[in-house]
């Protein structure tokens, strides 16, 4: 996600490094001084590519720039058409499952999200190349597995799998079979980063994107309380994704959707939940609490349906906002031709300024606001699960 506007945090961070380093934490990739640093090909806009080191990646992010890391695509000799026209999907013109969704939504728990996020942010960092990042992914996998195992769905083919990468932190995919292979996807990214010293400094990542991670986990838990969904009677298959290495250039989600494209997977929609917990920026601006519906680099039909979902199932309105190129994992779905959308906690300019620092902690989040994102996620998935797409 974006760079905190308060760059003075960087000065403060540099004076607090020793306090933020875990006792047994050592810098990663401690290469010899005479070795040239590894370089990566990034894309900052359609056709705008450059080779950079990993340190240069973080410098670009500190400047507020977002990008795809497309190194793997080049190495494989394949580059997708940038934002190809997605397959035509006829999203519903109205909400059709109001009674079921509202009954399920009453079971969503702020306490569950708080408890999960408190545990998830207790890892020193969730940096994708770190030991702690692998440990946090393992903890999250166990929570997702337990959520599925505690439902009827486990008896009807639901499963949770790791999606392994060339780096240590894996992505996680929970699948709930439907009557067809047409698939509805919800995603969040599980990794975190401290933009000042990524390999050693604390990166609790409560809002970015611990909030989205636990929001969709809670939506999954409640969704599986539906016997129709759990028993595989929904029209469409449902997947929940937790991506690794979003902060490094959408690496995890690109790997997932590249594989899906090669397998000719029929992905009908993808919603990203990245930063769902901060409302104070909106209130401080004197504006009404709302969720931010992203309008750039997204699928217009899916986005329009999401507006209906927010209006029908949330207690607060939506505002339209933009986040730029490659701003979160939905962009990877779009890159491979799949309809995608993104809903964030507020107007982009009012979102948290503490992200990518040691101060992105649970105490600054609003779990009532996260509950609205959980309602929206649940409503969208349930509606689309039973829709003829």
Swiss-Prot record:
Query: What domain of life is recorded for the organism?
Result: Eukaryota
- Quick one: signal sequence residues? 1-19
- Keyword Zinc in the entry? The reply is yes
Q: Does the keyword Phosphoprotein apply?
A: no
In this entry, which stretches build a coiled coil? none
Q: Which residues bind Zn(2+) 2?
A: 208, 247, 356
Q: Where in the cell is it found?
A: Secreted
Disulfide pairs here are 323-327
State the Pfam families in the record: Peptidase_M28
The entry's free-text remark on the cofactor is: Binds 2 Zn(2+) ions per subunit.
* Gene Ontology biological process terms, A to Z: proteolysis
* Main function: Extracellular aminopeptidase that allows assimilation of proteinaceous substrates.
Report the sequence similarity comment from the record: Belongs to the peptidase M28 family. M28E subfamily.
Record protein name field: Leucine aminopeptidase 1
Question: Organism classification, top ranks?
Answer: Eukaryota, Fungi, Dikarya, Ascomycota, Pezizomycotina
